[in-house]
Design a protein with these regions (language model features):
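A compositional/biophysical signature of low hydrophobicity enriched in polar/charged and small residues
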Residues: 1-90
Length: 90
């Protein structure tokens, strides 16, 4: 079946303290659907790349990982419509 649905989620955290941030990142790293996590500068704190089986999986994960997490102040989901380049080689 694979994971054909790709989502990019930007996350603003409520608590930027070292221990809260480390715990939140540790929780994210355990999820099979999450392929990449980046701490970034700017209006958001973190960018999470997800590879999902379907929208139902996204809804379950986004509710559990983002909406119900007290340390997540705000999140926005973007879905990949077309992939034009994907190359991880240096």
């Amino acid at each position: 079946m694979g994971r054909p649905l790709k989502a990019i989620v930007t996350v603003k955290l409520a608590d930027h303290g070292v221990s809260a941030r480390k715990q939140w990142l540790a929780d994210m790293k355990t999820e099979a659907a999450i392929s990449q996590i980046y701490s970034v500068s700017g209006e958001t704190d973190t960018v999470v790349m997800m590879n999902l089986t379907d929208m139902e999986e996204f809804q379950e994960l986004s509710q559990r990982l983002f909406a119900e997490d007290e340390n997540v102040l705000q999140y926005q989901s973007l879905f990949v419509l077309e992939q034009h380049k994907f190359d991880l080689a240096l």
